[in-house]
C-alpha cells in the first residue's frame, strides 16, 4: 500500500476504511503516472480526502464542492502545511475548464448528485469530466455500487437509499465509460458494509469472499477512465 494511503488513512478515507483503502490502493497502483507536478481536480470533495491524497504526493490540486469544501478540508491543509491545494465552489454538472487537468478525482459523489435513477445526468457528469481532462488524462474514482439485494435492503432501511441516494450498477459504470478512450476497474466489498457488529472482521473476510462471488455482488467500484 502506498505510504500516503497507509499513513493518512483517516484524512483520506472517513468510513469503511479497510475496504475503501484497498480500492484507493488499486487506483494508486494502476494510474498511468505519479501525482508529482500534475494538475488535479477533485469534485464533490466535502472533506477533501482525495485532494489530500494527491497533494501530499506533490500534485497541484483544486479541491471543489458545490458550496465549497468543508472546514475539515481546509483545516487538514493547514495542519499539514499543504500550500498546493486551492479551494473552490464548482458544480460537477458544469465545469468551467477544457483540457486542463491530468487527473479528476471523486469518491461517493454520483448517487448524491442524481438522487434517483437518472442515468442521463450521470452521463452529463462524466462528459464534463472528460471535457476538463487533458488528452491522456485520467478520472480516478471510487463509488458505491448497488451490489447484492441484501445491500439494497440495508441501505433502504438504514442508509442513504432512504433519502433516494442512487447506487449505480456495474452495467451503469460501463455505460458511463463510453466517452473515454479506455477504462479499467476493480470491485470490492461484500460483508464489510454497515456500521454494525463485527465490522472489522467482516471487512477482512471480504478479501477472500471477493475471489469467489460475482463482481455484481460487491458494493464498491474503483474506476480509472482515460481520455
Regions found by a protein language model. Give the residues of each.
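A short, conserved alpha-helix within the catalytic core of class I
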Residues: 113-128
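Conserved alpha-helix/loop element of class I SAM-dependent methyltransferases that forms part
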Residues: 16-36
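Class I SAM-dependent methyltransferase SAM/SAH-binding core
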Residues: 49, 53-83, 88-93
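Acceptor-substrate binding/catalytic loop of class I
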Residues: 155-171
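Conserved glycine-rich SAM-binding loop
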Residues: 46
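A C-terminal cap/extension of S-adenosyl-L-methionine-dependent methyltransferases
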Residues: 184-227
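Conserved beta-strand signature within the Rossmann-like core of class I S-adenosyl-L-methionine
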Residues: 136-143
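A short acidic, Gly/Pro-enriched loop at the edge of an enzyme's catalytic core
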Residues: 93-104
Amino acid at each position: 500500500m502506498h505510504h500516503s494511503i497507509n499513513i493518512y488513512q483517516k484524512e483520506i478515507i472517513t468510513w469503511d476504511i479497510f475496504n475503501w483503502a484497498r480500492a484507493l490502493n488499486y487506483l494508486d497502483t494502476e494510474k498511468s503516472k505519479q501525482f508529482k507536478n500534475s494538475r488535479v481536480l477533485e469534485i464533490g470533495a466535502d472533506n477533501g480526502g482525495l485532494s489530500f491524497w494527491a497533494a501530499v504526493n506533490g500534485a497541484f490540486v483544486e479541491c471543489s464542492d458545490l458550496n465549497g469544501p468543508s472546514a475539515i478540508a481546509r483545516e487538514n491543509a493547514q495542519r499539514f502545511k499543504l500550500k498546493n491545494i486551492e479551494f473552490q465552489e464548482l458544480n460537477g454538472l458544469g465545469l468551467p475548464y477544457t483540457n486542463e487537468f491530468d487527473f479528476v478525482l471523486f469518491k461517493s459523489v454520483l448517487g448524491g448528485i442524481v438522487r434517483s435513477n437518472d442515468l442521463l445526468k450521470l452521463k452529463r457528469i462524466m462528459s464534463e469530466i472528460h471535457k476538463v481532462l487533458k488528452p491522456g488524462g485520467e478520472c480516478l474514482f471510487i463509488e458505491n455500487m448497488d451490489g447484492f439485494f441484501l445491500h439494497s435492503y440495508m441501505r433502504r432501511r438504514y442508509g442513504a437509499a432512504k433519502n433516494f441516494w442512487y447506487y449505480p450498477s456495474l452495467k451503469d459504470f460501463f455505460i458511463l465509460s463510453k466517452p473515454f478512450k479506455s477504462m479499467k476497474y476493480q470491485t470490492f466489498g461484500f460483508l464489510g458494509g454497515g456500521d454494525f457488529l463485527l465490522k472489522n472482521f467482516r471487512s477482512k473476510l471480504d478479501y477472500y469472499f471477493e475471489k469467489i462471488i460475482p463482481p455484481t455482488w460487491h458494493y464498491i467500484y474503483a474506476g480509472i477512465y482515460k481520455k
